[in-house]
Amino acid sequence: IKSSAASDVYKRQCLGMIFSLTFIGLSGCGQKKTELVNVSYDATREFYKEYNRLFEDYWYGRTGEKVEVIQSHGGSGKQALEVANGLGADVVTLALEGDVNVIRDEGLIDDGYINDYSDDSSPYTSTIVFLVRKGNPKNIKDWDDLLNDGVKVITPNPKTSGGARWNFLAAWYYFKKQGQTEEQVQASVTKLYKNVAVLDSGARGSSTTFAENGQGDVLIAWENEAFFALQEYPGEYEIVVPSASVLCQPTVAKVDEVTQMNGTEELADAYLSFLYTDDVQRLEAQNFYRPVNRDIQKEYESSSDARNIKEIPYDGKWIVSDIDMADIGYFGGWEAATQKFFSDGGIFDKIYD
């Protein structure tokens, strides 16, 4: 009897060990992924979809930790306000420094964030171009042509969209460069916005209005949005590169208060740092952003510097380098530009009243 009882105990112990090991194994299989939230702007959807998969694999290989990056996209200005008002972003990858400053001013991002990463925390750049319909029926060649009677312009709203602010500043720079006075520049830009048929809240909305809904004659667009249109609708659209534009510097930052609360500081830092690696810089170029690594950017520079682009170059060399681009310093920095042009009662409000 004692032997039988001992045998039963032994069997129960063995079964218990097997159950425990099975449970541990199943727990490992269903291990919860660490979540990282990236709040970005409209025109980055395709790029971050690819980048996030690349980063998740990289991080797992480096640490053994499974990560899931959750994306949020929308007009950059609107996205910044959402984060400032409590949307729990670990990182932001917004259209411009001024939008990140909105979050910083709420105490969620540390002062000096602009120096956390290379090139003023801008891992890729862009510029502003025009997208027109096949054959360029309104003969759009430069900013002056957007003022012509009968030309219907599509652009997003600079009160909600970071890309729209770059659009506005590019137009302002062009007319200023023509030797116009401040009053004359404002009159020219006012006339341009009188021709705006639809003012969407974000860049992707404007692209949809123009390309899918068939409204307007010309779309003022992020360079990458324009090239994606050529890729998605071959033969239907053309890019016109204006003689003057702006150097758009999308800006990235950790949301320090959130990462400290979530314990994701190291993960968030790695996520943003990885944007500067060579393979990712090439991925950015393949998504029609300009890499900040000059050697890699040169790999994608066009030799023709064509002003009218009807298709994606077969050799992948799409970057037009011969453009006069003003950076935000020309306008006194984002604090000054926001106050002058985009604040309540600023120049845009006077123009588009």
Where are these regions (language model features)?
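Single conserved hydrophobic/aromatic residue that forms the stacking wall/gate
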Residues: I1-Y10
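Sec-dependent N-terminal signal peptides of Gram-positive bacterial secreted proteins and lipoproteins
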Residues: K11-C29
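Early extracytoplasmic/lumenal segment of secretory-pathway proteins
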Residues: C29-E106, D116-Y117, W222
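Alpha-to-beta junction loops
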Residues: G86-V92, G150-K152, N213-A221
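A conserved helix-loop-strand patch within extracytoplasmic ligand-binding domains
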Residues: R104-K176
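Periplasmic-binding protein-like
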Residues: S122-T127, V189-Y193, D200-S201, E232-M261, ...
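Ligand-binding pocket segment of bilobal, Venus flytrap-like solute-binding proteins
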Residues: Q178-S243
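Extracellular/periplasmic juxtamembrane helices and adjacent flexible linkers that interface
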Residues: T259-D353
